[in-house]
Amino acid sequence: MHKELDDFFEDVITVRLTPERDGLDIIDQTLLPGIRKRICLRTKEEIWNAIRELKVRGAPAIGVAAAYGMAVTADHIQAEDFSAFYHALVEIKNYLASSRPTAVNLFWALNRMEQRALAEKEKSLDTVKAALFEEADRIREEDVAISRNIGELGFGLLKKLKKEGEPIGILTHCNAGTLATAKYGTATAPMYLALEHGWEGTDMHVYCDETRPLLQGARLTAYELCHAGITTTLQCDNMASVLMKSGKIHIVFTGCDRVAINGDSANKIGTNQVAILARHYGIPFYICAPSSTIDKSCPDGDHIPIEQRSPDEVTQMWYKERMAPEGVDVFNPAFDVTDHDLITGIITEKGVCHAPFAEDFARLKI
Ligand code: MRU
C-alpha cells in the first residue's frame, strides 16, 4: 500500500494503548471529519461512555476497545487471591457489556478476556494481569489479519465483475472501514486490497450512503476513501435506488454487527432496504464479517437485540435548530436485520459463505 495511505491508517488508528499502557488512546470519531483528535480513556466509566457515545464504534473496534478496557481496568484490581480478582473482573466485564447491545463482537471479546484470565488462574495475579494485556493485543492483531483476508476474498469478487476500461461501481452503507476495525475495515477491505494489488483509485467508484441519523457514511467512509484516493460519491440514503436503476452499481459491500446462524444479519439501520433494492435490480449484495460476528447461539434475526437510540439524533442533531415539532414521537432503531435470503454471500476471513448459511458456517468450522 502506498505510504500516504499507511500514514493515514496510522493517524486514525481506532484504539491503541497509551505508551505507559495505563489507558486507551482512541480517535474521537464523533469529531471526524472536521477535527482529528485523540483522547485518552482510563476509567471503566470513560470507556463505557466512549462506546455508548460512538467515540469508538463499529463492531470489531468496539471489541478491541472492550478488550483493552478490561486489561487496563483489571490492572488496578487489588485482590488477595484469584477468586477475589475474578469477582472484580466479572463486574468490569458485565459493566462494559452493557454499553451497547447489538454488536456481538463486544461480548465475544469480553468473554475471550474472561476465558484468558481463567486459563491463567493458577499463576500469580501479576501474571494474570499481564496475560490480559497480551490477549487484548492479540485480539487487535488478529483483527488486522482477518480483515486482510476478507479483503482478499472481496477483491476476488471485484476482479470477476470488473469490465476492462470501466470503474467498478460499489455501494456501501454506514462505515465498515478502517475506523470500524484495527486496519482495513471489512466492507472497505476489498477496496484497500485492490489498491495493494495495483489498482488505481479510479478503477473503483464507491458510492457511500450518507447513513442517517448519525452520518457514518458521510463523516467516516467518505472521509477514509477520499484519503485513499478512491473515486467516491456521497449520496443520501434515499438516493440509492436511482443509482442502482441507472446501472452504476455492480456490487454492494456492507459490514455487520451480528449474524444469526441462519444468515440473518444485523447491520446499521437502512442496510435491509439496500439489500431489498439490490435484489430488485439484480445486484449482488455481500455482507463482510469476521467470523467473530457470527453468533452461533442466535437462531435467527428475531433473536438479535436491536439498540434504540435517543430521539435527538433524528430531530435536532446536526441541524442549526430543531427540525421536528417538540414532543413528536420518534422511531430510532440503530440497526436492522437483513433477511438471509436477500444476501448473496457473507465474506468471512475463512471463506465466502452462501445459503444455506448454517451449512457453510459448519463447513468452514465457524
Ligand atoms: O452504530 P455503529 O456506527 O457502531 O454501527 C456500525 C455498523 O453498523 C457497521 O457496519 C458494523 O459495525 C460493521 S463494522 C466493520
Per-region residue spans from a language model:
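Short beta-strand segments
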Residues: 27, 65, 107-109, 171-175, ...
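Short, glycine-rich nucleotide/cofactor-binding loops
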Residues: 40-44, 175-181, 261-266
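Positively charged, low-complexity intrinsically disordered leader regions
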Residues: 2-45
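Acidic-glycine-rich active-site phosphate/pyrophosphate-binding loop
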Residues: 35-46, 127, 164-168, 221, ...
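Short, hydrophobic/aliphatic alpha-helical segments
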Residues: 39-55, 89, 168-172, 317-327
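Small-aliphatic-rich amphipathic alpha-helix that forms the alpha element of a beta-alpha
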Residues: 49-56, 62, 273-276
